[in-house]
């Protein structure tokens, strides 16, 4: 059977070998293709930014955040909106066109640093061109299985690092050294001169930076909301109207709680937002009343039963049912 896609970035992948027709997470082949292409153009931009740093040129915070958010967009259960992903591809290419003009020596840059969707007359190529390139640039484009596995292991580690960084960035916490490493390592996955031993070393370095990224996020979270403490959480429901919040973005939760004060609207966490109850700063909100439901993978039935609005802050979403899509 012909592969419509190939994705094996999560532990629940089909047959423990890879989703090839549709993602177990609900991801469709066309979404998988555009995620692959977004990673590819992010690698190209990262090659440019890495070369700029070598030449002594500073890379802007906006560019760092763009690459970080691109990777975060492609992690499991984060974004199934193809139009939004394609928009990020266009934006990434636009930034790269500007930055590559600042590079003094482009001789060592990979093909991904030059690939573009602009035609000779300056217009954008059709979506068919995007999908054709995505097929060329996907996971299986690396033929050697060992090299492929190591490159993807590094990429998935960088995606995890991007998740930590993205959440820390929202709380105005940045580490330029993490950004520089993430981009250098991402660009290195295009370097055919690197051996398996080289990639193993880079994998270990990625792990070290992953720990550093977690520390940055922990410092950002505890600095803003205090140190988590043992807390009893209500798992029942009240009589007031309610809003359900899922994901990991504590800043989004804080903003919602501020906006709902005195309105008679209660706020409930779902799934991975449950730990928010442990932070002292959130205990001052009387309408932050408890947790509704269970794990993220039960959301289709639980969101259907919850009759209020649902706020998804980060990567916990599955393609929604029509019965509650308008409330999401």
Provide a role label for each language-model segment:
Residues 2-328:
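Metallocofactor- and cofactor-centric catalytic cores in central/energy metabolism, strongly enriched
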């Amino acid at each position: 059977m012909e592969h419509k896609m190939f994705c094996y970035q999560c532990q629940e992948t089909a047959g423990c070998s890879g989703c090839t027709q549709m993602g177990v997470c609900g991801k469709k082949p066309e979404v998988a293709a555009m995620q692959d292409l977004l990673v590819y153009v992010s690698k190209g931009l990262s090659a440019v930014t890495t070369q700029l740093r070598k030449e002594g040129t500073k890379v802007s915070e906006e560019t760092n955040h763009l690459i970080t958010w691109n990777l975060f967009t492609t992690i499991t259960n984060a974004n199934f909106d193809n139009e939004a992903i394609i928009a990020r591809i266009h934006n990434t290419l636009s930034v790269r066109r500007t930055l590559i003009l600042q590079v003094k020596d482009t001789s060592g840059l990979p093909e991904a640093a030059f690939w573009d969707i602009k035609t000779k007359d300056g217009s954008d190529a059709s979506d068919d061109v995007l999908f054709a390139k995505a097929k060329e640039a996907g996971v299986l484009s690396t033929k050697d299985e060992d090299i492929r596995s190591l490159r993807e292991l590094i990429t998935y580690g960088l995606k995890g690092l991007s998740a930590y960084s993205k959440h820390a960035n929202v709380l105005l916490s940045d580490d330029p050294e993490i950004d520089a490493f993430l981009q250098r390592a991402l660009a290195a996955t295009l370097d055919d001169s690197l051996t398996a031993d080289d990639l193993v070393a880079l994998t270990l370095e990625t792990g070290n930076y992953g720990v550093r990224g977690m520390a940055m996020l922990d410092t950002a979270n505890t600095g803003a909301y205090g140190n988590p403490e043992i807390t009893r959480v209500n798992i029942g429901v009240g009589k007031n109207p309610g809003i359900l919040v899922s994901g990991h973005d504590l800043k989004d939760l804080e903003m919602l709680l501020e906006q709902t004060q005195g309105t008679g609207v209660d706020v409930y966490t779902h799934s991975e937002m449950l730990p928010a109850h442990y932070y002292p700063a959130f205990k001052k909100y009387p309408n932050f009343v408890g947790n509704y439901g269970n794990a993220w993978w039960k959301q289709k039935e639980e969101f259907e039963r919850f009759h209020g609005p649902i706020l998804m802050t980060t990567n916990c979403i599955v393609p929604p049912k029509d019965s509650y899509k308008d409330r999401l």
